[in-house]
């Protein structure tokens, strides 16, 4: 089987982290974000994976090529000279995706969930249509494009309603698909949208179905969702693979701590915390709902809450970081500084309080 991951471009929503590293290589729960997807595809029997990229592919090649042998897959980079949207990349990779008659998976690189690829393939085969969209239920459907089903045929899509003012359903597109190769014939070689241009054609043919996603789902392409998705992922691990979570007397609940990290015995960690390799956490530190990427130092008695701390950053003594603050690579926060919701660009030093949302350049 084959799969295409829509990697895309600059990752602007996840800045300042993506100023230093392409978004797919930003670590989510201590592994590059895209590796979660490559592993799930490989486990479902996918042997050919296409990465559709238009930004810094050379940076990703060396990192991702080493996963080919590990997971027994062929990884091909399909490089766009201009951004082609969400459908154009399928046309660009037509030669690979149409090399046989088997269907192929498509997924957005920002999506983290309990990937149901095996079940999705079986369901797609059973209904005989040309495409299947994975759908997830949301509490506030008025914020999204909602899927409306045909009343006479289970799971057959009748139409899409963008941000409905009245309730028409609560299922939305989860950014995971399986499509037959002939769907590529509906796509032109230009920037185009699979959601607004390709899928409506399949709906008109009565050939597009939904598969309901069980478990959590999150688009982690921006900081607040990255943190929320981390919490959901850890919650899922606690239910399905509790052995993968870190344990200890100073861990409140649901944390992943790299074995190389050094944590003071009287620091308190959790819930919903990820600490990367070679981090050093001092005495009296409290970390809640936060992610620390590799080589970070947090000195004594600081509080880190709802924050992403970028690689090689240092937090001084008696600091308080909160409010979805994001520190880029190699940021230094001096002692006794309060940071609330700031986005701090790489290599900056902060010695004064930042009491409200700001971009520190």
Swiss-Prot record:
One of the protein's GO biological processes: GDP-mannose biosynthetic process
SUPFAM superfamilies reported for this sequence: Nucleotide-diphospho-sugar transferases
GO terms assigned for molecular function: GTP binding; mannose-1-phosphate guanylyltransferase (GTP) activity
Superkingdom, taxonomy of origin: Eukaryota
Keywords: Cell cycle, Cytoplasm, GTP-binding, Nucleotide-binding, Nucleotidyltransferase, Transferase
Known function: Involved in cell wall synthesis where it is required for glycosylation. Involved in cell cycle progression through cell-size checkpoint.
UniProt name for this protein: Mannose-1-phosphate guanyltransferase 2
Organism: Candida glabrata (strain ATCC 2001 / BCRC 20586 / JCM 3761 / NBRC 0622 / NRRL Y-65 / CBS 138) (Yeast)
Lineage, broadest ranks: Eukaryota, Fungi, Dikarya, Ascomycota, Saccharomycotina
């Amino acid at each position: 089987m084959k799969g295409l991951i829509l990697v895309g471009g600059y990752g602007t929503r996840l800045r300042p982290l993506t100023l230093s590293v392409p978004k797919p290589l930003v670590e989510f729960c201590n592994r590059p974000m895209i590796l979660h997807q490559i592993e799930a595809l490989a486990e479902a029997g996918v042997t050919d994976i296409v990465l559709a990229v238009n930004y810094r592919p050379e940076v990703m090649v060396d990192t991702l090529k080493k996963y080919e042998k590990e997971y027994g897959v062929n990884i091909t980079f399909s490089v766009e000279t201009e951004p082609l949207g969400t459908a154009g990349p399928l046309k660009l990779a037509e030669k690979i995706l149409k090399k046989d008659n088997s269907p192929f998976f498509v997924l957005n690189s920002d999506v983290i969930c309990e990937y149901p690829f095996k079940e999705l393939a079986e369901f797609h085969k059973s209904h005989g249509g040309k495409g299947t969209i994975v759908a997830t239920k949301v509490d506030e459907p008025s914020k999204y494009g909602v899927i409306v089903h045909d009343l006479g045929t289970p799971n057959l899509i009748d139409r899409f309603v963008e941000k409905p003012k009245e309730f028409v359903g609560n299922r939305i597109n989860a950014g995971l698909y399986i499509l037959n190769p002939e769907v590529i014939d509906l796509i032109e070689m230009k920037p185009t949208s699979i959601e607004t241009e390709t899928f409506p054609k399949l709906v008109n043919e009565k050939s597009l179905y939904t598969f309901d996603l069980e478990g959590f789902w999150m688009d982690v392409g921006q900081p607040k969702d990255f943190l929320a998705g981390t919490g959901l992922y850890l919650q899922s691990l606690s239910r399905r693979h509790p052995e993968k979570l870190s344990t200890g007397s100073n861990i409140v609940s649901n944390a992943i701590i790299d074995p190389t990290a050094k944590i003071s015995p009287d620091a308190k960690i959790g819930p919903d915390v990820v600490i990367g390799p070679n981090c050093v956490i001092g005495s009296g530190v409290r970390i809640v709902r936060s992610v620390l990427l590799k080589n970070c130092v947090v000195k004594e008695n600081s509080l880190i809450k709802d924050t992403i701390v970028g690689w090689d950053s240092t937090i001084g003594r008696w600091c308080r970081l909160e409010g979805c603050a994001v520190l880029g690579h190699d940021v230094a926060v001096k002692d006794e500084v309060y940071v609330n919701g700031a986005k701090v660009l790489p290599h900056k030093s902060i010695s004064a309080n930042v009491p409200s949302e700001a971009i520190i350049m």
